Amino acid sequence: MASVLEKVLRVGEGRVLRRLEAYAKAVSALEDDFSALADDELMHETVELRERYSKGESLDDLLPEAFAAVREASKRTLGMRHFDVQIMGGAALHLGNIAEMKTGEGKTLVATTAAYLNAITSRGVHVITVNDYLASYQSELMGRVFRALGMTTGVILAGQTPEERREQYAADITYGTNNEFGFDYLRDNMAWQASDMVQRGHYFAIVDEVDSILIDEARTPLIISGPSSGEANRWFNEFANLAKRLEPQVDYEVDEKKRTVGVLESGIEKVEDYLGIDNLYESANTPLISFLNNAIKANALFKRDKDYVVMNGEVLIVDEHTGRILVGRRYNEGIHQAIEAKEGVEVRAENQTLATVTLQNYFRLYKKLSGMTGTAETEAAEFMSTYKLGVVPIPTNKPMQRIDQDDLIYKNEKAKFDQVVEDIAKRHEKGQPVLVGTTSVEKSEYLSRLLAKKGVRHEVLNAKNHAREAAIVAQAGRLGSVTVATNMAGRGTDIMLGGNAEFIAVAEMNARGLSPVQTPEEYEAAWDQVFGVVKATVAGEAEEVIKAGGLYVLGTERHESRRIDNQLRGRSGRQGDPGESRFYLSLTDDLMRLFNAGAAESLMGRTSVPDDMAIESKVVSRAIRSAQSQVEARNAEIRKNVLKYDDVLNRQREAIYGDRRHILEGDDLHERVQTFLTEVVDDILDQHTGEGSGDDWDFDALWAELKTLYPVGVSIDEVIAEAGNKGRINRDFMRREILSDARIAYKSREESLGETAMRELERRVVLSVIDRRWRDHLYEMDYLKDGIGLRAMAQRDPLVEYQREGYAMFQQMMGAIREETIGFLFNLEVEVNQAPNGVESSAVAAKGLARGDSEARLSYSAPGERGEVEVRNQRGQIEQAATARAQQHSSAAVAAPEQGATQRGAFGQRVSAADDAAPANRAERRAQKKPTKRH
């Protein structure tokens, strides 16, 4: 049942749909005119539309003709005509909305209309997809439509060089993943030359599977990190061994629902005995606490082949939603290292954050944002509040014929899977294709073994064989096929009855060695014949599949999010095809077990239901909906909180990145450096001169500090002589004298190096200092954020405290940038390179001005589903380095309690005022009966 907020958000929906229908009619009215155009005339439409736009016509005015041109180009190149509902979807995208379109309604084709229209501005359009394969596939297929209209397409893929990326971004429409676009934004803001930058702005983005990218992946930021000093800590391995000796419920407690562990007294004793320390509560031992908690969590909460897999000596996280391996993605706060230690693989060194941005704030950079998905309605409120995006449900082209059966609930998992296998076998026997959704790699392999015993041929699609994902999904609608997949896997590739003709045709073209990029003319010439043959074969098989009942989707467990369940169901019944879906559940499923399945258990108990008999009950259905709502609300709150804190950092990031961009684009820094010089001198005078005259000042200390800044050319005696005596010197007089001397020294420095070299030195120094100080500031802000929650104990709002202290730290950083810049400009030993003809070159070299981080050593960390971090190197290969130095450091730090706050021990236990010293031994602690805190 829709909430009040959901109903409010739907007010005006009818008016929007009427506007979209009007656009669709206007486009259809032009169809015959555009069909009559020759190919070169159709291509010339782009030139005409661009001319009209440059003369002041709006994109809204040009929409009917632009959309009609795309529809015609698609008919000619792909043999696919945009339905009216697809035209409506494209208009919704152009107007800056999320178009909610059911699976199979052709969202990839929908994007072409809005992308083409907005590319008329020549400002670049970005189409964001969920993985590299889809980016490459869509740019290849839809690129044929755009080429027919005289537009270019590009694709951003992991491992491309900066030159390749720059070329792809220069295209009219560029496809790629959210991670690649975000990392390029961060890299551009670490560039040392304008020529190193690859992106050309953020004008219009179309986000495919928008709920997956903007909701599911929005909890953790994109991070570029580089090696920090220090080695991987031996404590991870020590505590991994120790955790295996601890017993659950005896030495520690586990709360699976909250994902927390609590260490009990006997556990603390064992830790102290193992480590040979007297008291874990002593401040010197507090860094060990995070290692202990992480080791226990790695053992108790993270299961191999469910939460992660171990391949080639590396721990790889499995996406809880899709079952895919999240390439290199990492858990934060030392959890990933703890799992590596638990599994006996190499524990990698941690990294330091160099640049970071959340997906929310990256996508807010776009002047206009839009998206497509089949399941956005449940998150409509969050889309509106975070991104100012409305959700517009687009009608289906044909009425939905899928039958969604009621859930069947069994007492235990074995009984459930036995019935699942029976159901699959019956469907398989009559030729009906079956898609089975499981929640983990472990479950998919378990079901696969049961099906093999039953003699049912099938394909398994999970994190361990994701390389064949698209091929498996494309064939999942064929007669008699059985596909066991982790939930939502294969998203973005249509399951068409009889097989995906498009996919099969592209594969055939590739097999013939034809490419739309390398051999575009041969590709176009062969396409129609290949596609025609494949299409005819598929159509015949599709008729048989329809007679068998269409695609049957069988879910083996409810997901914690309603959207994921709906996505699985949505694989069936595309484009008016017949289909069926059903979920099989058991009382031991994670969702039922963790979120109050008491109602279901009591119902089973009362009715004495045999193990192999299912029940259908509204009570159980309500319990499931309630559990899902709890999880969704919790996850939404996490994302909201992440955004609140990142908004503070985002304002600072915009200021720093704006400064860097102006510098790279050639702003003259001479005036700014002079301002820096004035402000630094003012700061020094503030420290050494108070109210009144010079009689009370320490001139020696003042001169000593000035000499660390620049070569002072005036002596104390000369200044006093100029004034007459110390008593006649005031701050304004001193300021004039010192600034005059400093400017003379700067002018002398410039004359010795040459004006051109000095301007280049200013640019290099300012960039170098900004980058170094910004990197340190990110570390400090991470540290501040991790400890700021403790302020709540002093009745203070952590967010307000974070804003206040973050601003103070930013001001400190800006002061340090000014002071360090002036110090470097005066004191660096600089070598000016001369050109062969003797003309002065602007190239300067100085120690400390080289780029601090080699591209090859950087790591690229992307957002995960539960705050984990994806880490890759420059070539796109998996890395296992820690996300940031601050995470480890802050987890080991203990914040001092605020004045008046309740004091806490190392494990968070209360310490009374009379007892604020740490207990001397275990007996003393037991006597005090101190409780432990959950972590």
UniProtKB/Swiss-Prot annotation:
Stretches the record annotates as Disordered: 879-935
Biological process annotations from GO: intracellular protein transmembrane transport; protein import; protein targeting; protein transport by the Sec complex
Membrane-topology annotation of the record: Peripheral membrane protein
Cross-referenced SUPFAM superfamilies: Helical scaffold and wing domains of SecA, P-loop containing nucleoside triphosphate hydrolases, Pre-protein crosslinking domain of SecA
EC number, as in UniProt: 7.4.2.8
Pfam families linked: P-loop_SecA (PF21090), SecA_DEAD (PF07517), SecA_PP_bind (PF01043), SecA_SW (PF07516)
Top-level taxon in the UniProt lineage: Bacteria
Cell compartment(s), UniProt: Cell membrane; Cytoplasm
Catalytic activity reported: ATP + H2O + cellular proteinSide 1 = ADP + phosphate + cellular proteinSide 2
Keywords: ATP-binding, Cell membrane, Cytoplasm, Membrane, Nucleotide-binding, Protein transport, Translocase, Translocation, Transport
Binding site for ATP: 86, 104-108, 494
Gene3D superfamilies: Helical scaffold and wing domains of SecA, P-loop containing nucleotide triphosphate hydrolases, SecA, preprotein cross-linking domain
Top EC category: translocase
PROSITE patterns: SECA (PS01312), SECA_MOTOR_DEAD (PS51196)
GO cellular component: a single term: cell envelope Sec protein transport complex
MF-aspect GO terms: ATP binding; protein-exporting ATPase activity
Similarity comment: Belongs to the SecA family.
Function: Part of the Sec protein translocase complex. Interacts with the SecYEG preprotein conducting channel. Has a central role in coupling the hydrolysis of ATP to the transfer of proteins into and across the cell membrane, serving as an ATP-driven molecular motor driving the stepwise translocation of polypeptide chains across the membrane.
PANTHER family membership: CHLOROPLAST PROTEIN-TRANSPORTING ATPASE, SECA INNER MEMBRANE COMPONENT OF SEC PROTEIN SECRETION SYSTEM
Subunit text: Monomer and homodimer. Part of the essential Sec protein translocation apparatus which comprises SecA, SecYEG and auxiliary proteins SecDF. Other proteins may also be involved.
Protein name: Protein translocase subunit SecA
Name of encoding gene: secA
